[in-house]
């Protein structure tokens, strides 16, 4: 029944079909694609060479890699991710970082650890995966409008309760980004509601304004209420390769249905 609540057509597939039909009728027209956030350039040569080397290593007994022990990614990659966050003044432990096959997967899968009766707040417009993954689990989804009246930066309404909050900054699809002061307001709202923020930072590399955080963890208190997801799709052209990561701070705790205090990082 929950699957029947989804829209009949996938947004990106529908756009692709319309593009294909239009191009067939107008072969001389050059289109600027504003649909799915794909890349337009190939992988960097250094990435290609590293992948070739990694493939060669898999064919040698001494350098072959099988299952990774921690289940959350190789340390050499997590160390590189932690090093990247240090540029923003954010300190992460390796066991707070989970490497995945792209942010999209974790955006959908992360909700499995939360109760189906949770109320989910999503800024609108938003990446369709946020809505679909929660509707498939039967959750109530409410919206905070992002439009010209608020500079395309939806802010929390203290009179509205939510258990899960999806924020994307810079936003997909509007491109707007939250300032530190705006994120402070969302963090205060989340704590007041004992809610969890799922912060999508897939487009953080496009930020140039020094007042706009690359990570929600640049703001005090975020580690107690936020899970952050990021991707190499936009920073390294990995849309066809699938690699990203999720950060779950050890300081992030939730209350289970039986009243026990649970560390999400241990789930």
What does each of the following model-derived ranges do?
Residues 31, 117, 162, 194, ...:
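Local beta-strand N-terminus motif with an aromatic residue
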Residues 169, 197-198:
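Residue-level marker for buried hydrophobic side chains located in beta-strands
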Residues 32-34, 121, 142, 198, ...:
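Hydrophobic/aromatic beta-strand patches that form the interior of the parallel beta-sheet core
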Residues 40-44, 173-176, 205-206, 236-239:
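Short catalytic/ligand-binding loop motif for oxyanion handling, primarily in non-cytosolic enzymes
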Residues 61-190, 204-219, 227:
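Conserved core of the PLP fold type I
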Residues 5-101, 109:
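N-terminal small-domain helix-loop-helix segment of the aminotransferase-like
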Residues 201:
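Walker B catalytic acidic pair
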Residues 218-267:
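Conserved core segment of the aminotransferase class I/II
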């Amino acid at each position: 029944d929950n699957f029947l609540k989804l829209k009949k057509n996938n947004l990106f597939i529908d756009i692709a079909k319309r593009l294909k039909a239009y191009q067939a009728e107008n072969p001389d027209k050059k289109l600027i694609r504003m649909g799915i956030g794909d890349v337009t350039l190939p992988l960097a040569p250094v990435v290609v060479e590293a992948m070739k080397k990694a493939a060669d290593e898999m064919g040698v007994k001494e350098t072959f890699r099988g299952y990774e022990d921690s289940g959350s990614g190789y340390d050499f990659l997590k160390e590189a991710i932690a090093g990247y966050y240090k540029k923003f003044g954010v300190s992460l432990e390796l066991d707070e970082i989970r490497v995945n096959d792209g942010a999209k997967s974790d955006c959908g899968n992360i909700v499995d650890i939360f109760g189906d009766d949770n109320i989910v707040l999503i800024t609108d417009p938003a990446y369709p995966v946020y809505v679909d993954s929660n509707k498939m689990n039967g959750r109530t989804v409410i919206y905070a409008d992002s439009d010209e009246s608020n500079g395309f930066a939806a802010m929390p309404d203290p009179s509205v309760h939510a258990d899960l909050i999806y924020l994307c900054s810079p936003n997909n699809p509007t491109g707007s980004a939250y300032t530190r002061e705006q994120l402070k307001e969302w963090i205060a709202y989340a704590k007041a509601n004992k809610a969890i923020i799922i912060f999508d930072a897939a487009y953080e590399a496009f930020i140039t304004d020094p007042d706009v955080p690359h990570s929600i963890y640049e703001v005090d208190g975020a580690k107690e209420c936020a899970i952050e997801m990021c991707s190499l799709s936009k920073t390294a052209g990995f849309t066809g390769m699938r690699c990203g990561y999720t950060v779950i701070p050890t300081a992030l705790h939730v209350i289970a249905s039986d009243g026990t205090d649970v560390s999400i990082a241990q789930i």
